[in-house]
C-alpha cells in the first residue's frame, strides 16, 4: 500500500440579491484517491471517490405579504472499489492476515507466491483478495427540491398567516462490475540449481456485467399546509397552529 493518498475539496459560494429577491448558490467538488499500489496492472482497480454537490436557495418577495422560497440541492457521487467478491472489511482483514513467507510479491511485473509443494504452510499474501480481479463502480444521483409559499393574512386579522410547502426527494444508484483475472507464478527449483517460475491461471480482459446490474431508485413527496396565528396583546402572547401533512 502507498503511504498516503491524495484528497481534495473545493467549494464556491455566491450570494446576493435585490430588494425583491435574494439568492445563494453553492457548488463543491470532493475527491479522494486510494491507498493501493497499481504495480503493472493495466486496469485501475484502486479505491476512488468523487462527489459533486450543488445547492441554490432563492427567496422572492412576490408582494409585500407574499414570500416564495425555492430550494434545490443535490449531489452526484462516483465510488470505485476493488472487485474481490467480498466486502471491504474482509478485503482489509486479509491484508492484516498476510504473512511475509506467503510470496515475494511483484517480481519483474508478475505476482509470485510461495510454492505449497515446498512449504507446508504458505498462508495468503496481501494481493490475493483483489489484485487483477477488476473493480466495481457505484454512481449515485441525489436530488432534493422544496418550495414554500408564505402568505400573510393580516387583512383578515393581524398575525394570521398561511404556509404551503412541498418537497420532492429522489435517489438513483447504479452499480457496474468489471471482472478480470491475472495469472500468478510459483518458484520451482530445477535440477541444475536454477529457479524458474511456474504459471497458474491466465490474464483476461475486463468483463462488464449487465447495464442494469445493481440499479436502485427511491423517491418521495412531502406536502404541508399550515395556518399560523401569532399576536401579542399587551404582555400576553397568543399563538396557534393548524397543520396538515401528507407524506
Regions found by a protein language model. Name each.
Residues 25, 70, 147, 162-166, ...:
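Membrane-embedded beta-strand positions of outer-membrane beta-barrel proteins
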Residues 1, 30-40, 119-131, 197-209:
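Flexible, solvent-exposed coil segments and beta strand-coil junctions
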Residues 245-247:
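Conserved small/polar residues in nucleotide/adenosyl-binding loops
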Residues 39-44, 57, 130-136, 148-150, ...:
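Extracellular loop and loop/strand-boundary signature of outer-membrane beta-barrel proteins
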Residues 3-28, 32-35, 45-124, 136-140, ...:
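Flexible loop and strand-edge segments within Gram-negative outer membrane beta-barrel domains
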Residues 41-45, 85-96, 178-188, 194-195, ...:
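Flexible, surface-exposed loop regions and adjacent strand-edge segments
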Amino acid at each position: 500500500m502507498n503511504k498516503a493518498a491524495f484528497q481534495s475539496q473545493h467549494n464556491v459560494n455566491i450570494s446576493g440579491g435585490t430588494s425583491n429577491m435574494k439568492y445563494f448558490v453553492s457548488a463543491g467538488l470532493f475527491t479522494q484517491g486510494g491507498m493501493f499500489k497499481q504495480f503493472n496492472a493495466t486496469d485501475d482497480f484502486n479505491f476512488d471517490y468523487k462527489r459533486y454537490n450543488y445547492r441554490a436557495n432563492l427567496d422572492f418577495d412576490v408582494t409585500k405579504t407574499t414570500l416564495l422560497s425555492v430550494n434545490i440541492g443535490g449531489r452526484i457521487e462516483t465510488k470505485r472499489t476493488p472487485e474481490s467478491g467480498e466486502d471491504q472489511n474482509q478485503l482489509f482483514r486479509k491484508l492484516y492476515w498476510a504473512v511475509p513467507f506467503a510470496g515475494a510479491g511483484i517480481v519483474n511485473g508478475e505476482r509470485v507466491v510461495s510454492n505449497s509443494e515446498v512449504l507446508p504452510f504458505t498462508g495468503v499474501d496481501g494481493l490475493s483478495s483483489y489484485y487483477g480481479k477488476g473493480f466495481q463502480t457505484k454512481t449515485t444521483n441525489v436530488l432534493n427540491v422544496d418550495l414554500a409559499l408564505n402568505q400573510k393574512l393580516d387583512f383578515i386579522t393581524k398575525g394570521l398567516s398561511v404556509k404551503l410547502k412541498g418537497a420532492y426527494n429522489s435517489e438513483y444508484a447504479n452499480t457496474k462490475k468489471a471482472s478480470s483475472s491475472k495469472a500468478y507464478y510459483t518458484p520451482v527449483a530445477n535440477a541444475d540449481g536454477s529457479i524458474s517460475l511456474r504459471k497458474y491461471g491466465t490474464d483476461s480482459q475486463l468483463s462488464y456485467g449487465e447495464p442494469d446490474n445493481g440499479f436502485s431508485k427511491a423517491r418521495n413527496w412531502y406536502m404541508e399546509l399550515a395556518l399560523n396565528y401569532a399576536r401579542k396583546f399587551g404582555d400576553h402572547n397568543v399563538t396557534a397552529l393548524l397543520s396538515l401533512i401528507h407524506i
